[in-house]
């Protein structure tokens, strides 16, 4: 059985130094060009950004001091696209019901170097496994640690990203007891520690208020006038036994009308 990697002071300092060098090496404007979600997410709109952008108000780029709001942020494909493309967005407000996803957003915003230090160790240990059996054992050990709910914020974020990169098809699914149960994805050499993306996303998240709760509570945090809402609610479950959060169309429509 594998143990959760313990990052030594030396490893942490080396990671912080390397991360600082990485940030220095990123040219001006690179954030806008390369920013992208730090995880794969079911229903993500990364492949539809061009079509979605065409639906924006024609004068969006000329508007001043825009407040951009996403009540269902998920993987954040549209969020990072908007923040990287439109400097007139002075603030963004994002929300999601998944508390570990939101914890990961907050860690990337506030403590990216610590997150990278842990992910580097995980990536090195994962890639040092000799065969598929060892890879699976390592994955299951991390999944068990994640489900134990004993980890603190930075470790939670690292585990969340790790299982997203190494599970089957990047799925997030829990059983009736709230335990993450997606099987091993058999990836031999995944990019677990995407340092450049984490640091670029951290830059963009500096002007983002990050919320965790029901979407209907987001309106209370938004001042009237000037806010632009992007709604992308989660898909309804195909069966009554599927453990995905469902939203009916009526509450969402009522929310849109009240926020208008």
Which functions belong to the PLM regions below?
Residues 2-6, 11-30:
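N-terminal export signals
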Residues 52, 68-82, 94-98, 161-168, ...:
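Conserved proline-anchored active-site loop of SAM-dependent methyltransferases
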Residues 61-66, 88-89:
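Short helix-terminating capping/connector loops at secondary-structure junctions
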